[in-house]
A protein has these predicted regions:
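Short, contiguous, well-structured surface segments enriched in hydrophobic/aromatic residues
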Residues: 1-38, 61, 113-124
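Secondary-structure capping and boundary motifs in well-ordered enzyme cores
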Residues: 6, 39-46, 99-106
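Contiguous, well-ordered alpha-helical segments that form the cores/surfaces of helical PPI scaffolds
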Residues: 12-16, 45, 52, 108
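Short C-terminal domain-edge/linker segments immediately following a structured domain
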Residues: 34, 48, 83-87
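Histidine-centered, metal-coordinating catalytic motifs and their short helical/loop contexts
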Residues: 42-64
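C-terminal, helix-dominated tail/subdomain
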Residues: 69-167
Length: 170
C-alpha cells in the first residue's frame, strides 16, 4: 500500500475495500459518469450477504429450511432473476418455493451476477466446471444418505438444473 503513495490504481483499491464500500463505489461511479452497471444494487447486496455468511462460517445448509412468514424476503424477487431461473427449465412451483428462501435467493443472485460480470471464457468455464463437479460428483457421492430429505434433494436438483443451464449457455 505504501508503494503507491496516494496514487493507488483502482484494481488495487478494489482489492482492499470492503464489499459494502465496493457497492458504494459502483453506485458513485455510475452516478458521476452516467455508466450503467451490468448489475443492480440489490443483486450486489445479496451477493454481499451470501459472501458474509460464508466468510463468517455460517452453516448455510441450516438456512435452507422453510422460513416462517415473518422471516421471508419482504421484497419480491426481481423479474430478471425469475427469468434467469426459468431459462434453466425450472418449473413455476419449484421456482417460487426456492426463490422464497433467503439463502437460496442469495445464491441465485450470486450465480446471476457471476454470469453477467465474468467475461473471461476460461475463468467462467473453470469455475462452472468446478461447480458442476461439486453438484454432480461430490454432492452425489452418497446421495442415498439424503434420499429421505426432500428439502435437500429438491434444493440439490434446483442448483443442478441452474448450473447445467449455465454450462450449456456458454
Amino acid at each position: 500500500m505504501k508503494k503507491y503513495r496516494g496514487e493507488m490504481p483502482i484494481w488495487v483499491f478494489v482489492e482492499v475495500i470492503s464489499f459494502g464500500d465496493l457497492e458504494d463505489l459502483i453506485a458513485f461511479y455510475a452516478a458521476e459518469s452516467g455508466w450503467e452497471s451490468p448489475i443492480d444494487g440489490k443483486s450486489l447486496d445479496r451477493v454481499r450477504q451470501i459472501r458474509n455468511a460464508a466468510a463468517h462460517n455460517n452453516c448455510i445448509i441450516n438456512d435452507l429450511r422453510p422460513e416462517e412468514a415473518s422471516e421471508r424476503n419482504v421484497s419480491r424477487t426481481p423479474r430478471f432473476i425469475t427469468d434467469f431461473v426459468c431459462r434453466a427449465g425450472i418449473g413455476e412451483n419449484m421456482r417460487k418455493k426456492k426463490l422464497a428462501n433467503r439463502r437460496i435467493n442469495q445464491i441465485v443472485h450470486l450465480l446471476y451476477v457471476y454470469n453477467k460480470v465474468v467475461t473471461s471464457e476460461n475463468t467462467r468455464n473453470t469455475r462452472l466446471t468446478e461447480l458442476y463437479d461439486l453438484l454432480h460428483t461430490r454432492m452425489s457421492m452418497h446421495k442415498d444418505y439424503f434420499a429421505g430429505n426432500g428439502l435437500l434433494t429438491s434444493t440439490h436438483e434446483f442448483f443442478v438444473k441452474l448450473t447445467d443451464s449455465l454450462m450449456d449457455s456458454h
